[in-house]
């Protein structure tokens, strides 16, 4: 019954905004198992459909139905096209003959008394699983596994909202069969590389794993043994798991807080937990902790904002401890127990605030190591930049008067702050500035980067000239070097490799105005991820794709109707999803989500573009974003590239930051069967000699700090699947190290006094007595 109601709601949603386009779906949200064993749902949206044009290697259940199921039993690239009175685009679907068919399903129970979490795991087959399992809301494990592939864009609403209550019988049988064959899952944590194993299979056909709650080891993977059943294995499941992210129910009588009428959707999510998100619309504001499977309204208490102010929301940022709203030009803070205006008592201007910005990249270990001394939010006016610290207290970082002095500009010139963003470097942020001597029709755009370790601003070799009325935004990409994407309403600009290369993104035809290729629509949203994907979404839902370090954009196949209200965000596996909003539906159906098969869509358009990756494989042993190196220590990194013979590729090491490390490199080369394998061994170390120096502490200060590195192939293209590994090396004393005292029971809270003694002969400074320290 639930499935029928949800599907009916989605159909009603689509009926309000019909135009000719077509999509495809599978039963799973994990496109890595898209294969010859998948049931591919085809859906044509519009009134001019006649039939489907299908290759002989595939079969369709009903060729004349706008909604039907496709099966392709032969691996390869299959061209699918609807025959309609209007000319429709064809797609080239890449169907693999994969042995990965089954999926893991899990539920989580939070145990607060010992800060642990119980994870119940079972295996399910998307093709034969229950409706509840498909919508990912089962509370008990499902043990049946059959081959099942699903397309997120065509998945049922039930699959997307996860409403299953118990495992299906098929999943129960499958899990027991896999267990008999030797399957035994475990949870692997990506950052700390820990493994948590279950007890024996329960009578309900589930494995139960106990693991601690964590804020610095949240990226996890469910993996299993290499066990085959009916020639199929289980796909690894990547997900995020941390302390429960609570959302607050609004008391009765609170009033809507919205964007101005006609505004496109605005999304904000937690830096590390993308499932904890907030959506602002011109009707309501919503908050979720499960990727909009469920949600609550976020409203303002009466008496604080006027009616006009409540409908003048300009920006919003969501954090675990509160939500920041920019209403007109004033910042308001909403927490569990208050809704207040921030002013000079919090270190920030009461009016004139133009925008808010937060960290875009999750750097868990570094954040955990020194979070107390770093900002987590930025705010700015035309002439001032503020940094926000713990408890939402701010400090002014700079003014345009100081920046004019830094840039050696005449006092009479006009210099304004456009926007401010954090870079990938954990200690840096950057301000985009507008400068003109005589402001006529254009303005010059410059950039300065702020380093919080030295409290310094540095002008970058980046300059653009844009129309005076242009409204600019930008993002730093996932890169050791400062790489950025800047955009206004119509164009996208780039600055790559520490601004050594910059310009305007073009299409294959040479067009730079994306609005002219999307019926005059403006740029709405730019989504970036950690593997170099950049998706540019227009207000009418036309989407363009840009790859990091590539200067050309390609238009993606139409997926969403031009009148639908949508936004892009990441699900719990950090895959791209589309969020739909329709205020005309029943309240519980107003928000719908669908995973978007970005990789399949890229493969489809590339069939005509002929853009292929120049290498076959690029591998490395970089398993963390953060490495610490103390005196006398070294770090060895292994990287390897495999490419066709005579291409002459190699691996490039790039770094950003203080030159306080030395490294040596050794290259191994091998040719076999027309392919070259080049392996690069890099060893990082320090050559500073601290023995018997008079300026020990000064020398130590000069040779400690943070460097950011990345390895990348010398050539790459839009279709290269692997990301360049980016990592930090922190050189110096590890502040997380402590003196450990053994031999005591941890269950008690009895305070004990300890002390230690260091022999005076071992100390650098001459002392008459041994050094005694109390703990």
Swiss-Prot record:
CC annotations in GO: CatSper complex
InterPro entries recorded for this chain?
Answer: CATSPERD/E, CATSPERE_b-prop, CATSPERE_Ig-like, CATSPERE_NTD1, CATSPERE_NTD2
Task: Give the matching Pfam families.
Answer: Beta-prop_CATSPERE, CATSPERE_Ig-like, CATSPERE_NTD1, CATSPERE_NTD2
Where does the record say carbohydrate is attached?
62, 114
* Claim: Glycoprotein is one of the keywords in the record: yes
Residue ranges annotated as coiled coil are none
UniProt keyword annotation of Hydrolase present: no
Q: Which UniProt keywords apply?
A: Glycoprotein, Signal
- Disulfide topology: none
Q: Which residues belong to the signal peptide in this entry?
A: 1-20
Which family is this sequence assigned to?
Belongs to the CATSPERD family.
Q: What is this protein called?
A: Cation channel sperm-associated protein subunit epsilon-like protein
């Amino acid at each position: 019954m639930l499935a029928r109601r949800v599907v009916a709601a989605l159909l009603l949603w689509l009926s309000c905004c019909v135009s000719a386009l077509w999509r495809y779906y599978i039963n799973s949200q994990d496109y890595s198992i898209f294969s010859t064993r998948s049931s591919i749902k085809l859906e044509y949206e519009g009134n001019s459909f006649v039939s489907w044009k299908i290759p002989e290697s595939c079969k369709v259940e009903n060729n004349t139905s706008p909604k039907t199921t496709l099966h392709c039993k032969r691996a390869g690239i299959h061209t699918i096209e609807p025959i309609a009175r209007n000319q429709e685009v064809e797609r080239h679907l890449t169907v693999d003959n994969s042995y990965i068919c089954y999926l893991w399903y899990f539920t989580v129970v939070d145990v607060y008394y010992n800060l642990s979490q119980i994870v119940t795991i079972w295996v399910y087959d998307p093709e034969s699983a229950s409706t509840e399992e498909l919508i990912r809301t089962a509370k008990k494990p499902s043990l049946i596994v059959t081959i099942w592939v699903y397309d997120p864009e065509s998945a049922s609403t039930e699959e997307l909202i996860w409403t299953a209550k118990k495992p299906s019988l098929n999943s129960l049988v499958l899990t027991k069969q896999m267990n008999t064959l030797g399957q035994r899952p475990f949870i692997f944590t990506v950052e700390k590389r820990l493994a948590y194993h279950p007890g024996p299979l329960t009578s309900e056909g589930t494995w139960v794993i106990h693991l601690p709650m964590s804020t610095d080891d949240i990226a996890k993977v469910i993996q299993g043994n290499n066990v085959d059943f009916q020639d199929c294995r289980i796909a690894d499941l990547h997900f995020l798991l941390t302390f429960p992210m609570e959302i607050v129910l609004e008391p009765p009588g609170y009033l809507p807080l919205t964007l101005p009428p006609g505004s496109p959707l605005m999304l904000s999510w937690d830096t590390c937990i993308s499932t904890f998100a907030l959506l602002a619309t011109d009707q309501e504001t919503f908050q979720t902790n499960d990727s909009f499977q469920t949600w609550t309204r976020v409203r303002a208490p009466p008496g604080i904002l006027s009616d006009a102010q409540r409908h003048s929301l300009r920006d919003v940022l969501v954090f675990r401890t509160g939500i920041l709203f920019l209403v007109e030009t004033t910042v308001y803070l909403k927490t569990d127990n208050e809704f207040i205006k921030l002013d000079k008592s919090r270190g920030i201007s009461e009016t004139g605030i133009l925008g808010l910005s937060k960290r875009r990249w999750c750097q868990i270990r570094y954040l955990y190591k020194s979070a107390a001394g770093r900002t987590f939010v930025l705010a700015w006016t035309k002439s001032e930049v503020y940094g926000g610290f713990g408890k939402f207290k701010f400090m002014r970082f700079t003014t345009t008067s100081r920046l004019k002095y830094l840039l050696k500009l005449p006092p009479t010139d006009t210099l304004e702050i456009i926007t401010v963003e954090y870079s990938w470097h954990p200690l840096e942020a950057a301000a985009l500035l507008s400068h003109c001597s005589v402001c006529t029709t254009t303005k010059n755009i410059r950039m300065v980067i702020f380093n919080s370790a030295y409290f310094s601003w540095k002008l970058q070799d980046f300059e653009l000239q844009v129309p005076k009325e242009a409204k600019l935004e930008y993002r730093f990409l996932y890169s050791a070097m400062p790489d950025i994407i800047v955009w206004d309403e119509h164009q996208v600009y780039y600055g790559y490799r520490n601004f050594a290369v910059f310009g305007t993104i073009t299409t294959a035809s040479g067009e730079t105005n994306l609005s002219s290729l999307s019926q005059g629509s403006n740029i709405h949203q730019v989504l970036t991820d950690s593997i170099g994907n950049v998706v540019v979404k227009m207000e009418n839902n036309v989407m363009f794709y840009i790859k990091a370090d590539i200067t050309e954009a390609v238009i993606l196949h139409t997926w969403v109707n031009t009148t639908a209200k949508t936004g892009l965000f990441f699900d719990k596996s950090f895959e791209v999803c589309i969020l739909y909003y329709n205020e005309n539906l029943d309240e519980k159906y107003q928000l719908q989500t669908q995973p978007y098969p970005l990789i399949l869509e890229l493969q489809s358009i590339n069939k005509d573009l002929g853009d292929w990756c120049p290498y076959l494989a690029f591998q490395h042993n970089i398993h963390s974003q953060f490495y610490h190196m103390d005196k006398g220590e070294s770090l060895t990194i292994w990287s390897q590239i495999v490419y066709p013979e005579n291409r002459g590729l190699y691996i490039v090491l790039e770094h950003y930051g203080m030159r306080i490390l030395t490294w040596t490199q050794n290259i191994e080369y091998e040719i076999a069967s027309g392919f070259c394998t080049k392996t690069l061994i890099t060893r990082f170390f320090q050559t500073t000699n601290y023995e018997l120096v008079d300026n020990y502490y000064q020398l130590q200060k000069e040779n400690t700090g943070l460097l950011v590195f990345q390895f990348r192939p010398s050539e790459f293209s839009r279709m290269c699947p692997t990301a360049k590994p980016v990592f930090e090396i922190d050189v110096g004393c590890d502040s997380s190290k402590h003196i450990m005292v053994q031999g005591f029971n941890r269950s008690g809270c009895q305070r004990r006094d300890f002390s230690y003694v260091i022999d005076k002969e071992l100390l650098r400074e001459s002392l008459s007595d041994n050094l005694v320290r109390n703990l």
